[in-house]
């Protein structure tokens, strides 16, 4: 069996060709980011290899967007607990179906910790999914802004929610969620700013990271988990 050896010295078979290609693309992106922004480069060296692919989502469009709705304005820990309780309401399927969610009484959803506004958003999303949201395959051929324009027509789906879909499900590598608190906090910490950067300032940093803003965002999120040195 043919094998390939990466820079790291790890031996990989052709069965892992996709992973090899991904890691090589990561290497290209990392080299670019380190050259264009040495301060970010120091953070990259400290954190190590990009693991963005390990956080990618599964499931159809309804599942991914409903998950993002549940995560809105909550800490990752709290959102994860609520999402797991939500999934437990539908033990017969890996990914809840839109019709099943629509048929679930609001009070049942409230008991697993979902707020009433989010119940309204998820059920509106379910109605759109049943009546004809684009499939993930149809979204694949659309550009980022067209996808954002299409999906933000659904109540409760804002730009940030769609950007999470772009990064973690559609694998778009040049998305900068300028309204994301984690990204902004990461910028403030990394560049020793006095306050959280506003949208314009965040976009200014992003100009140095294009076309790999998603990769830069991942490192900024991870930076918040680091202990002070």
Where are these regions (language model features)?
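Short, aromatic/basic-rich helix-turn unit that serves as a nucleic-acid recognition element
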Residues: 65-69, 73
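Short, flexible turn/loop "capping" segments at secondary-structure junctions
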Residues: 58-63
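Short helix-capping/linker segments at secondary-structure and domain boundaries
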Residues: 73-81, 130-134, 170-175, 223-229
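Acidic, Ala/Val/Gly-enriched low-complexity intrinsically disordered segments
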Residues: 2, 10-20
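Alpha-helical ds-nucleic-acid-binding substructure associated with the helix-hairpin-helix region
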Residues: 39-46, 74-153, 208-210
């Amino acid at each position: 069996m043919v094998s390939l050896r990466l820079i790291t010295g790890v031996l990989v078979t052709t069965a892992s060709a996709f992973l090899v290609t991904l890691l090589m693309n990561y290497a290209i992106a990392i080299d670019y980011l380190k050259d264009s922004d040495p301060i970010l480069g120091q953070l990259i060296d400290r954190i190590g290899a990009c693991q963005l692919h390990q956080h990618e989502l599964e499931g159809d469009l309804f599942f991914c967007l409903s998950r993002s709705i549940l995560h809105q304005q909550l800490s990752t820990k709290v959102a994860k607990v609520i999402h797991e309780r939500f999934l437990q309401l539908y033990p017969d399927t890996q990914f809840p179906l839109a019709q099943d969610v629509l048929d679930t009484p609001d009070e049942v959803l409230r008991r697993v910790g979902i707020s009433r506004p989010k119940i309204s958003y998820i059920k509106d999303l379910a109605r759109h999914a049943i009546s004809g949201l684009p499939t993930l395959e149809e979204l694949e051929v659309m550009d980022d802004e067209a996808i954002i324009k299409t999906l933000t027509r659904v109540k409760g789906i804002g730009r940030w929610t769609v950007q999470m879909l772009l990064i973690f499900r559609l694998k778009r590598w040049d998305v900068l969620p300028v309204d994301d608190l984690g990204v902004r906090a990461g910028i403030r910490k990394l560049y020793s700013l006095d306050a959280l950067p506003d949208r314009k300032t965040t976009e200014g940093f992003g100009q140095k990271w294009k076309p790999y803003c998603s990769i830069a965002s991942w490192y900024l999120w991870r930076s918040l988990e680091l202990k002070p040195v």
